[in-house]
Amino acid sequence: MMKRRDVIGAAAGLIGSVWVRPATADADELAAAVAAFAGGAPVRAGRVEFDIAPLVENGNTVPVTVRVPSPMTEADHVTTIAIFNQRNPQRDVANFSLGPRAGRATVSTRIRLAGSQQLVAVAKMNDGACWSRTIDVLVTLAACVEP
């Protein structure tokens, strides 16, 4: 005969296992999204400057700037800058296409963050090389939270 205590404990465990996603799944999904963007090219750390506050009070509108020092000439320029996140419902936050006429490889926007997480900015160069910068951001009031 099952006791009430056993039923309640089993139900709580089942609910917890459905609602809680392991952090490794988020990290694996983030790495997979970055790798898919790179298209098989190795993603190396460096060359990307990623400006975002390390502590964000409200995740609903977070200013972000990504810069890549590049001469932006026909022979050497940034073709794409992408921003990825670890915990939002979709891993790709933004994707910007650039060319030599852009003059500077700098993009600014505002994003939403679903809690404290890791962000990755990746720059793809015209020769196929990919450079990245990873930043951890603490968010006190989350956005993008699924019910």
Feature annotation, model-predicted:
Residues 136-140:
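Short beta-strand edge segments in extracellular beta-sheet folds
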Residues 24-59, 96-97:
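Transition segment at domain starts
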Residues 114-118:
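Extracellular Ig-like/FN3 beta-sandwich strand-entry sites
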Residues 126-132:
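Short acidic/polar inter-strand loop motif in beta-rich domains
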Residues 89-112:
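An anionic, turn-rich surface loop/hairpin at beta-sheet edges
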Residues 63-71:
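Short edge beta-strand/loop segments characteristic of extracellular beta-sandwich folds
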Residues 1-18:
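N-terminal secretory signal peptides and thylakoid transit peptides that target proteins
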